[in-house]
């Protein structure tokens, strides 16, 4: 989900 993309930062 969108949070997963944020964690990749």
UniProtKB/Swiss-Prot annotation:
Family membership noted in the UniProt record: Belongs to the FARP (FMRF amide related peptide) family.
Gene Ontology biological-process entries: neuropeptide signaling pathway
Keyword Cell division (UniProt): no
Main location: secreted
Location of the protein in the cell: Secreted
The organism of origin for this protein: Karoophasma botterkloofense (Gladiator)
Function field: FMRFamides and FMRFamide-like peptides are neuropeptides.
Organism taxonomic ancestry: Eukaryota, Metazoa, Ecdysozoa, Arthropoda, Hexapoda
The name this protein goes by in its record: Extended FMRFamide-3
Keyword Secreted: yes
GO annotation, cellular component aspect: extracellular region
Keywords: Amidation, Neuropeptide, Secreted
Residues bearing the modification Leucine amide: 9
């Amino acid at each position: 989900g969108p949070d997963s993309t944020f964690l990749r930062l």
